[in-house]
Amino acid sequence: AAKVTKAYIGIENNKPDAIKLMQEKATAYQGIEIVPLKVKYPQGGEKQLIDAVIRRQVPAPPAIPINVGAVVQNVGTAYAVYEAVQKNKPLFERIVTVTGKSVKNPSNFLTRMGTPMSQLIEMAGGMPEDTGKVIGGGPMMGKALSNTEVPICKGSSGVLLMNDKEASRAEAQPCIRCAKC
């Protein structure tokens, strides 16, 4: 229906082993290209990825990526679509990352929807004593959680456990748009 002839998989260039492995695997499929990406923020946003991978800019709204011939999917969504189309499997589980500097066993877990985040934290070695904040999602767009009994849902991607030092708020300073953050 979409008449797709080319697919790109973007991987940050600080992951050379992943890039090499994916390039080897991609040779078995016509029209798939692995694109090493600069490690920078923001890079994972839809518009930024389109610009970095195919050098097209999505105009201001109401324009959307399809207007420049692009569709962007994250790995979890792409995998869910594959399983639905190829295996007739409904979406009832996700891969969820549990990570953080103090986590004993940072891991990716294939997790059923509804599983409490607390169970994943236990599977990764338990709640570190120095935990200052628990974030559902990632460090930039995730949400701080006051309760780890929150269930995994289709939008869950990770649990980030920040230690006390990381969780402390830096003194507010005026933004001069230096891009250091």
What feature does the model see in each segment?
Residues R169-C181:
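Cysteine-centered iron-sulfur cluster-binding motifs in ferredoxin-type domains/subunits
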Residues A1-K3:
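N-terminal and secondary-structure boundary signal
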Residues R94-V98, G132-V134, S157-V159:
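Short polybasic amphipathic segments
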Residues Y8-M117, M123-P128:
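Hydrophobic alpha-helical positions that pack around
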Residues E12, S102, G132-V150:
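Short acidic beta-strand-loop surface patches of small beta-rich interaction domains
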Residues K143-E171:
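A structural-propensity feature for long, helix-poor, extended segments
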